[in-house]
Amino acid sequence: MTTPYKHEPFTDFSQEENRKAFEQALGKVTETLGQTYPLVINGERIETKDQIVSINPAKKDEVVGTVSKAGKEEAEQAVQAAAKAFETWRYTSPEERASVIFRAAANIRRKKHEYSALLVKEAGKPWNEADADTAEAIDFLEYYARQMLELAKGKPVNSREGEHNQYVYTPTGVTLVIPPWNFLFAIMAGTTVAPIVTGNTVVLKPASATPVIAARFVEELEQAGLPKGVVNFVPGSGAEVGDYLVDHPKTSLITFTGSREVGTRIFERAAKVQPGQQHLKRVIAEMGGKDTVVVDEDADVELAANAIFTSAFGFSGQKCSAGSRAVVHEKLYDQVIERVKEITETKTTANPLSADVYMGPVIDQASFDKITDYIEVGKQEGRLVTGGTSDDTEGYFIHPTVFADLEPTSRLMQEEIFGPVLAFSKVSSFDEALEVANNTEYGLTGAVITNNRDHINRAKQEFHVGNLYFNRNCTGAIVGYHPFGGFKMSGTDSKAGGPDYLALHMQAKTISEMF
């Protein structure tokens, strides 16, 4: 009998012993940098001429690893391997499938700091963000394995005299997993494990910016006893390999986390029935957000300022849940802005080699250029409060940047920037605050800072987001506690880490037997 699920605790880096342990892990990981990682198709290692080089965004001359790059030929091999493995894996008992995932979780937990240290190197994550990413990866494994054991029981339906009816779940087939680079361990692991534990097989195309952690995770699954072909590792370009895999007639399910642009493209392509295709493809998508922290007129200023700061600048604002918009009542507007400015200017932006660094780099040159362009837009649309500076000499560093006095329809208030840029907008009433909070095409997360119970109840009904928080930041969803997924153009509201998520990877089957 399994123990009840409880989320993996975060590491307290104020404790000297924890800091030393993490420093040792960083040293150990640094010694392994520069290794090469082949494709994995049907358990076979395949090296290709074309390669993807993963670099440390905090230190551009440091190569984290080199990964073989798949083309259409390798993508085809991966799909065929997954399709073949599906014919046996689908009949493997839920208990056996879950046991593989439990073993992988236990192994990762034993090497938790090493995995987190790799995230520091490959994505430039500060220690606490890397630690939370690894903890969430473990949580996904532990939670989904338990959920599968429950789902295996089926759901009760009525039976009549002389008739026995069952309602059970069966897997769908080959699943294409396209995870993002920002939660390079947690989301990659969660979206890979969910189809596996439900009896599907996987073709994993990791983010090109962060493929090394995915290669390591595939190794971990193999060591836990996952059979050949159940997961196939094929890094490659979205335009070539991604489109090919989305279009493939044997692809049954696509799970994607990334931009609105790519997500809608996947939806469009997946809807077209290809020659030889015998099913309608499902798409599970999370496509970003433009998330708002609303501050009511009776709010605690210190609480509001800290919630806004944390929401906006955790992991350099590179979260789909990042609170990049602060909508503040005019009575507290100036006070809140000033306090956010004070907090922001005490934080360190640097290579996250110590626990004292609050913010590291952005992920790559393209992101750096995009974000700095938005900062220039912000200077035209609003008032620069603090930040606005950047340096890509050694790494891709942008200081946390705050703009005030933005119009609700301005670009900084409407477009997902995915960087450390925060926009403030002033409102004169709670009605207006809700109107502004809902005025984007996204609906992922949001927060309301208020002591007004009537306003809380109104926001529960009228603030149209998938994850709504009160009197706290709008980031940091925990598996099993805050199932995650959004409305509108934020995606399919699939609620990762929730009780309904695994069923999206399966088909319900009704069985009726007469006696």
Swiss-Prot record:
One MF term in the entry's GO annotations: 1-pyrroline-5-carboxylate dehydrogenase activity
Keyword tags: NAD, Oxidoreductase
Entry superkingdom: Bacteria
Any one GO cellular component localisation term in the record: cytoplasmic side of plasma membrane
Biological or metabolic pathway of the protein: Amino-acid degradation; L-proline degradation into L-glutamate; L-glutamate from L-proline: step 2/2
Catalyzed reaction equations: L-glutamate 5-semialdehyde + NAD(+) + H2O = L-glutamate + NADH + 2 H(+)
Active-site residues, as the UniProt record annotates them: 286, 320
One BP annotation, GO: glutamate biosynthetic process
InterPro entries: Ald_DH/histidinol_DH (IPR016161), Ald_DH_C (IPR016163), Ald_DH_CS_CYS (IPR016160), Ald_DH_CS_GLU (IPR029510), Ald_DH_N (IPR016162), Aldehyde_DH_dom (IPR015590), Proline_metab_enzyme (IPR050485), RocA (IPR005932)
The protein's Enzyme Commission number: 1.2.1.88
Family, similarity comment: Belongs to the aldehyde dehydrogenase family. RocA subfamily.
Protein name, per record: 1-pyrroline-5-carboxylate dehydrogenase
Organism annotation: Bacillus pumilus (strain SAFR-032)
